[in-house]
Amino acid sequence: MAKTIKDIKAMVEQAAIQSIHKSSSNVKQIMVKTGQEHIVEDVYGAYDPLLYERTGQVKDAFITTNESNGVSLDNIREDDGKDIATVIETGQGYTYPDSYGYGYGNPRPFMKNTSETLRDGRLTAALKKDLKADGIKTD
């Protein structure tokens, strides 16, 4: 049993990490869903390509990884060894000429925007659901 506030804090943090590390955690689902929404809005919504056909695979290439202090989100879309997610995020590495002025080489920072959106409280709400599912009251 915890004897100090520091001990209680450590117990709560450990319970939270265990809850979000589960494969079906609400936190992981919200992270992926928010990333996918930003792909649609920030990436696909930026322009309709004329020189190539979109595969739509970048939207489905999100992964979550359990970390010692929480969960990380990444997009692992590659094509012939090229990190497509980074090319889209930074605008660096496009091989198509932008002869039509669509902005092929412009950054479309979907990961940065996902991170910013996730600060709106939806992660806290998801964590509360995960903790409640584990029998821990948060309200």
Swiss-Prot record:
Protein name per Swiss-Prot or TrEMBL = SPbeta prophage-derived uncharacterized protein YomN
Q: State the organism of origin.
A: Bacillus subtilis (strain 168)
